[in-house]
Amino acid sequence: DRQGSPRPAPPIRFQRWSQIALGAPVLLVLAFIYVPIAVIAVLSFQGPQGGATFPLRDSGTLWYQSLTDLTVITEHTDYLGQAVFDFRKSIVNSLKLAATTSVISTVIAMAAAQAMRTRFRGARITTYVILLGIVTPGLAISLGIVTLASELGIRAGLFTTGIIAHVVWTMPFSFLVIMVLFNRFDRRVEEAAYTLGASRLRAFFTVTLPMMKPAVIGSLLFAFMLSFDEYAHSIFIMGSDRTLPLTLVSAVQLRITPSIF
């Protein structure tokens, strides 16, 4: 009777080939993602006579030294000597927008996730509506917000149409991050707090929120990175305000220098 006997282990040679077959596609994907980033990092050490060419014609740290020269890094000038691109202001705008967006998205996502836990009628449809911001094209969202703002007489800007578009984009991701931890949350801890006389509000701030701290931090960081690097949701909605991605794209269209890398 061999039904209870263990199966023989596969040959060592077969194990090695299976590891190679599984590992090769993973290595190709990682190379596809990270090799262009490595090339850009190497090009940043291009010499003064080199441009966006590989391999390097010369090497040096000239373009890193130019980061301390505000006339070089913060202003590209046209033939009249007028400032065209202000990188310093663009960086500040991106930091302000990303920080504000991350906080607002996390607060809204936390409230939405808390509501989803009650399993009310229509909760599944509401979840799909919340996640629409992920699958909707950024240009469509931007154009819709700008059109609505124009009808309402709201001026397009960083903290008007800009913040709305970025919250619409980042909030679904924050919602998913928070819901992952909520699905593993032990409700008995909250029920114990209610039994001891804590109100729902007090139980949330003293029990639920501390236990959700990893999800809150992850949501803040995720939303910040998405907002800071976002271009499609910013192209039509910033008005005269410029974020770093918008300024970088405009600068690259005019001239590519290793300082941009």
Where are these regions (language model features)?
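A structural signal for multi-pass alpha-helical bundles of membrane permease subunits
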Residues: 34-49, 90-93, 142-154, 162, ...
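Transmembrane alpha-helices
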Residues: 24-27, 32-35, 167, 175-179, ...
